[in-house]
C-alpha cells in the first residue's frame, strides 16, 4: 500500500486516484467512479463487480480463477487482463482514458445482465429444481 501511495504522489495523481481500503458501504463510493479496476489474484464471486455493473461503471478486471470471466461474459461486459500483467492493465486504463466509448458501451450492456444475480430469481429457480426431485 505504501508503494502505491508513493507512486500516486510521485506521478501527481492524488486528485484522481483514491485508495480507500475496505469500506462497509461500498455503494456510497462506487457510484462516483469513472472506472472500476479489480486486480485480484483469486476470487469467489466478486460482488464488487456486480455492484459496479449496477451503476454502469466501466470495468477492467484481472481474469483470475472463478468470477470475473463469468460475470463479464468473457470480456463482453468489461475488459479482462491476465493476472499479474500490469502492462496490459496500464494499456487498458490509458486506452479507456483516451477513448471511453467501447468500455462505456460494455458497461451499459452489463446492466441488462444483472438479473443473473438477483436473489429472488435465483431462489425461485432453485425451488423449481428442488420440486422436480
What is the meaning of each model-derived region?
Residues 34, 56:
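A short alpha->beta transition loop at the rim of the catalytic pocket in nucleotide-sugar-dependent
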Residues 94-95, 119-133:
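C-terminal alpha-helical cap of glycosyltransferases
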Residues 22, 41:
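Aromatic "clamp/platform" in nucleotide-sugar-dependent glycosyltransferases that forms part
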Residues 73-86, 95-100:
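Conserved acidic donor-binding segment of nucleotide-sugar-dependent glycosyltransferases
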Residues 88, 95, 102-116, 125:
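A short, well-ordered alpha-helix in the C-terminal region of glycosyltransferases
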Residues 51, 64-75, 79-80:
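Short acidic/histidine- and often glycine-rich active-site loop of Leloir-type glycosyltransferases
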Residues 4-21:
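Nucleotide-activated donor-binding/catalytic signature segment of Leloir-type glycosyltransferases, i.e.
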Residues 58-62:
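Short hydrophobic beta-strand element within catalytic cores of glycosyltransferases
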Amino acid at each position: 500500500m505504501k508503494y502505491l501511495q508513493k507512486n500516486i504522489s510521485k506521478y501527481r495523481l492524488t486528485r484522481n486516484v483514491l485508495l480507500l481500503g475496505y469500506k462497509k458501504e461500498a455503494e456510497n463510493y462506487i457510484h462516483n467512479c469513472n472506472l472500476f479496476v479489480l486486480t485480484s489474484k483469486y476470487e469467489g464471486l466478486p460482488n464488487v463487480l456486480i455492484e459496479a455493473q449496477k451503476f454502469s461503471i466501466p470495468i477492467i478486471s484481472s481474469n483470475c480463477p472463478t468470477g470475473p470471466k463469468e460475470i463479464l461474459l468473457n470480456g463482453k461486459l468489461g475488459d479482462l487482463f491476465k493476472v499479474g500483467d500490469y502492462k496490459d492493465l496500464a494499456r487498458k486504463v490509458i486506452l479507456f482514458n483516451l477513448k471511453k466509448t467501447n468500455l462505456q458501451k460494455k458497461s451499459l450492456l452489463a446492466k441488462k445482465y444483472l438479473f443473473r444475480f438477483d436473489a429472488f430469481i435465483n431462489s425461485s429457480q432453485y425451488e423449481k429444481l428442488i420440486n422436480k426431485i
